[in-house]
């Protein structure tokens, strides 16, 4: 299960990602928001983080205007490792090296095709453990 949420600036891209994921046979938990009226992004970040924290979702996606606000909000939640990704390589590395459990993207800065490439890269990657494990453990225990 993939939890996904956005603020008003990420509504369109969130829906496009949901459609893409469902097309690929993925189960999606859509946590809003559902309109382009201005909302506060931290509440949507928290909703996605809770799903990941309690195991109801394997990982999550958050979308706001730039991805920065959602990344900051998500990383305040215990056990969450949210990575703002800008291309397929950063999405892959977020999983392989940092064991990210949430990726954040910018609805105003990322086109549809690039968003799909980033999601696909993250989904196809696995944590590499090894030298990365103590680093991730240090983040988790901070």
Question: Where would I find each of the regions flagged by the language model?
Answer:
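C-terminal binding/interaction regions
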Residues: 5, 9, 88-142
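A short beta-strand-loop structural module common to alpha/beta enzyme folds
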Residues: 27-38
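Short hydrophobic/aromatic-enriched beta-strand-loop microsegments
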Residues: 27, 80-87
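Short active-site oxyanion
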Residues: 1-2, 56-60, 79-81
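Short helix-loop-beta junction
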Residues: 20-27
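N-terminal beta1-alpha1 ligand-phosphate binding loop
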Residues: 1-17
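Short Gly/Thr/Asp-enriched flexible loops that form oxyanion-binding sites at enzyme active sites
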Residues: 69-80, 89
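Short, structured active-site "lid" loops
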Residues: 44-62, 66
């Amino acid at each position: 299960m993939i939890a996904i949420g956005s603020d008003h600036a990420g509504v369109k891209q969130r829906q496009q990602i949901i459609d893409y994921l469902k097309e690929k046979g993925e189960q999606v938990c859509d946590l809003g928001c559902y309109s382009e009226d201005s909302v506060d992004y931290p509440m949507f970040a928290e909703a996605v983080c809770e799903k990941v924290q309690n195991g109801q979702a394997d990982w999550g996606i958050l979308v706001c205007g730039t991805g920065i606000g959602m990344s900051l909000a998500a990383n305040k939640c215990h056990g969450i490792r949210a990575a703002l990704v800008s291309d397929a390589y950063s999405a892959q590395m977020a999983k392989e090296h940092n064991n990210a459990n949430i990726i954040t993207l910018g609805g105003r800065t990322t086109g549809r095709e690039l968003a799909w490439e980033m999601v696909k890269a993250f989904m196809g990657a696995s944590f590499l453990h090894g030298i990365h494990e103590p680093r991730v453990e240090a983040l988790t225990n901070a």
